Structures are given as structure tokens and as C-alpha cells.
Amino acid sequence: AQASAGAPPEPAPAAAPDSAAIRVARSVTPSQVDPSLQSGFNQFNAGNVEGARRSYGEVLARDANNRDALLGMAAIAQKQSQFEQAQLTYQRLLELDPNDADAIAGLASVRPADPGQTESRLRRALQRTPDAAPVLFTLGNLYAQQRRWAEAQQAYFRAYTAAPGNADYAFNLAVGLDRMNQGKLALTYYQRALALARDGIGNFNQDAVRTRIAELGGQ
């Protein structure tokens, strides 16, 4: 289906982390999840950035190398446009594990670099971990910045397939499809993104999405 009148929105520049305590909670029993880590994740997604910072800080006071808490701190810095601090935190994570897909994706999203070098770095990370959703999402954004929409849409689709509960992944997939004039499919994923973002988790303008849904013939 062809897109209706009106311009598709721009992709979300960064995704709310499908990370930290929630990934831990998927792999271990809830009683084993650090309460401060879970609190940090919940507060970040509720918009309480300072509360999240305190909770992650409690974890790091006990374990300075805690990966999930460091990722949380990096996400906070990025959300507050403290890009230098975010970069330092991602670099710290890469010192702990040079192959950390989340850190590779995070660093690529906050540090200006040659697009070709960034693409190569992200592709190398995907060779090691083909289903690394944050890397796929960041690669999609890199393609989108260059208006390589077919490649962006494919990367967003792979990111969404790997993490279908992430509102930002669904939104950017919708944008990619929209830019490819696949309005009917785009509508489905815009609606999915809104449904996933009902709890406030999402780095996109929900009113703009509702407007675009109406333009595409949705309710």
C-alpha cells in the first residue's frame, strides 16, 4: 500500500534499553535479581532518572564492574545528553569485555565517527552475535541517517524480531516500512509501538505516531 499524505516521522535516535534487570530476570529466578538493579530499571522506564541513578549507584558501590548497572548509567547519561559521560561508561564496559554488543552499539550511537568505520564495527559485532538487537538497531539508524532505507528497514526488522517487546524497535521498523511506501505494514508496527509504549517506555513522540496512524487510515 502506498503511504498517505503527510511525511513519515524520523526514526528514534536511541532505544530505551531492553536490558539491565529485565534481561537478568529472564535468565534467573526473580529472587536472584538484585533489588537495586530491578529498581533502577523500573525507575528509568518510569521516567524517574534520578531514582534510577541512585539505584544503579547502590549496585556499583557493591560491584564497580556490574555490567547491567553500568549499562543503566550509560543509558541515563545518554538520555540526559551527557554524551561524554555515556561514552566513558561504554568504553569502561568494552574494557571489561571488548565484544559486549550493547556497549559497542551504545558507543556507536554517542560518538561521532566515520560512518564507514562505524558500519564496519557494527558488522563485526554482528558476526559474533547475529541477533544482537541493540547493534542491529544502531546499524539501522546509521543506514537511516544516510537515507539507505531498504537496508535500514531490514536492520530494524531483525532488531524487532530479536526483541519484539521493545517499543522503539517497533517504531523504527514502522518508519523504515513507511519510507519504503509500505503503508499498510507500517501502520501495523506504528500501532504495535504505541501499544508497547503505554507504560511510557519509548523514545518517540506518541502524538506524532497517532497522527501518522490516522494519515495511514488507522484508528
Describe the predicted segments one by one.
Residues 69, 103, 135, 169, ...:
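TPR alpha-solenoid repeat register
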Residues 26-65, 75-79, 112-113:
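Alpha-helical segment of the N-proximal tetratricopeptide repeat
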Residues 72, 106, 138, 172, ...:
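Canonical tetratricopeptide repeat
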Residues 62, 96-97, 128-129, 162, ...:
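Structural marker of alpha-solenoid helical repeat scaffolds
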Residues 46-54, 79-92, 111-124, 146-158, ...:
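Structural signature of tandem alpha-helical TPR/SEL1-like repeats
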